[in-house]
Amino acid sequence: MALISSTSPHTTVSNNTGAFMRQVIYATLPGLAVLTWQFGWGTVINVLWAVGAALVSEALILKARGRPVAFYLKDYSAVLTAVLLALALPPTSPWWLTLIGVGFAIVVAKQLYGGLGMNPFNPAMVGYVLLLISFPVAMTQWIAPGEAPSLMQSWQLFTGQLPVDGLSGATPLDTFRTWAGNESELASHGILHGQFAGLGWEWVNLAFLLGGLYLISRTIITWHIPVGFMAGLALP
């Protein structure tokens, strides 16, 4: 009988790898809800499409490697990779952009290194970097917060039937880069210093903070990594 080696952690407790992955997916739901509220249904469409593409890509590469497909798909790592990448993409992303990013993340950044636990880099972020370098225009087209298109418009953006130019707007990072060196203009610009939650970005950040607190409360993560990351951003 052939033995199937599973990825770590090799424990006898109830929290297996799939359970941990599902908890992280649950933690993204507040962020997904707020992104949908502020930017429309494009993020939901992206997530669903990315998950489907990730599962198909994972199944094909597992089949090619002679690995049991169902056994490895149930660890939810491909689903989590797809969700994280889709949440990082603009809600105006066309279908092919998401497909390229997810395919590269699963096939190259994850499976070519041997699968879960063997890849040196986060597959979702590898896919994101590939898209940012290869398609910088498409990756920086965001809808203005609070001006969410309808479900039909979001679908038309996804399929490429509706041009994104008339709906997209500058992000805070775009504005900061444009006005860098001109502190007076930067300080008075509404997109950076608007009324609390008036521009939507604060609510997005708070929603993902809520997800992080959920993971800490469930002991899925500890406070050290997020605090260290934020300190690295804040300290010179």
Label the predicted regions:
Residues 21, 25, 44-48, 76-80, ...:
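Hydrophobic alpha-helical transmembrane segments
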Residues 27-34, 58, 78-86, 102-109, ...:
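Hydrophobic, membrane-inserted alpha-helices
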Residues 6-9, 56-68, 106-117, 210-221:
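C-terminal ends of transmembrane helices
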Residues 40-53, 92-101, 194-206:
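Structural signature of hydrophobic alpha-helical transmembrane segments
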Residues 11-21, 62-74, 91-93, 192-202, ...:
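Short, amphipathic, aromatic/basic-enriched membrane-interface segments that mark the entry/exit
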Residues 118-209:
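Long hydrophobic alpha-helical segments that form multi-pass transmembrane helix bundles
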Residues 1-63:
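N-terminal signal-anchor module of multipass membrane proteins
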Residues 77-151:
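A generic, well-ordered mixed alpha/beta core segment in the N-terminal half of proteins
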